[in-house]
């Protein structure tokens, strides 16, 4: 008797480069029992991104569609509807498109896809012309979602509204801590790259975009307190 094929979840993302949400999804994919479940990705960029080779090596598939810019909204809706009609095997859709999840998940609901996940990874800061679209889409999104995921309370409140807080699943970002285990030989190499020759110098590092959501002011406050105790 032939073994059952794995359940294939369709993940919607802009591009599978090394962003936070994309890295989180890759961590899940790497640790799944891929004989039972796997991810396929529908992206909105036409270039080969950082994670695509690994996705395919792990058995995932990459599909491409037009960008989700305002001038392409009509085209995107037509193409996504046609895609679902051509791929009825997808019974679970996991969207990382924030408020833009409104488009594909509404179409997925119309096409009878039973599990439609919207995942909030962020909350916008400030107001610009895009904010008008964001507000329109996010207010209509919950109607077409079966499962609401969020990385934290603020992100969930923004995308789904505070009234839906009790429905939101706090999906904390999974991290393979073994990748960050202290390695003395690697530490020596990195310190040398930055010209830190004194072995008694305490070194702290941070990787992150200079955006408000990364909360650099809090990191600076922490560093100030650390520096008081370790002035070297």
Sequence positions of predicted segments:
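Short His-centered aromatic/hydrophobic patch
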Residues: 95-101, 120
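N-terminal strand-loop element at the rim of the active site
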Residues: 3-7, 11-19, 23-75
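A conserved, positively charged/aromatic
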Residues: 110, 117-151, 160-164
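Donor nucleotide-sugar binding/catalytic pocket of nucleotide-sugar-dependent glycosyltransferases
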Residues: 63, 143-186
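Short hydrophobic "strand-cap" motifs at the C-terminus of beta-strands
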Residues: 12-13, 151, 171, 206-210, ...
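A conserved nucleotide-sugar
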Residues: 36-39, 198-201, 216-232
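A short helix/loop element that forms part of the nucleotide-sugar donor recognition site in Leloir-type
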Residues: 80, 181-196
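A conserved mid-protein helix/loop that constitutes part of the nucleotide-sugar donor-binding site
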Residues: 19-27, 202, 206-225
């Amino acid at each position: 008797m032939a073994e059952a094929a794995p359940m294939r979840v369709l993940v919607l993302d802009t591009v599978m480069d090394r962003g936070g949400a994309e890295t989180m999804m890759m961590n899940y994919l790497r640790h799944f029992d891929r004989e039972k479940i796997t991810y396929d990705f529908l992206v909105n960029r036409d270039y080969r991104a950082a994670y695509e080779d690994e996705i395919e090596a792990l058995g995932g598939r990459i599909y491409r569609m037009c960008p989700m810019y305002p001038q392409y909204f009509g085209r995107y809706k037509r193409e996504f509807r046609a895609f679902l009609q051509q791929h009825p095997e997808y019974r679970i859709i996991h969207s990382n498109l924030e408020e833009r999840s409104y488009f594909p998940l509404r179409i997925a609901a119309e096409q009878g896809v039973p599990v439609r996940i919207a995942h909030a990874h962020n909350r916008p800061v400030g107001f610009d012309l895009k904010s008008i679209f964001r507000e329109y889409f996010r207010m209509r999104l919950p109607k077409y979602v079966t499962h609401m995921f969020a990385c934290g309370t603020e992100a969930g409140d923004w995308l789904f509204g505070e009234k839906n807080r009790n429905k939101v699943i706090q999906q904390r970002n999974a991290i393979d801590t073994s990748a960050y285990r202290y390695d003395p030989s690697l530490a020596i190499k990195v310190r040398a790259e930055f010209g830190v020759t004194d072995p008694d110098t305490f070194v702290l590092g941070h990787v992150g975009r200079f955006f408000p959501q990364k909360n650099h002011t809090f990191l600076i406050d922490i560093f100030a307190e650390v520096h008081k105790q370790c002035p070297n």
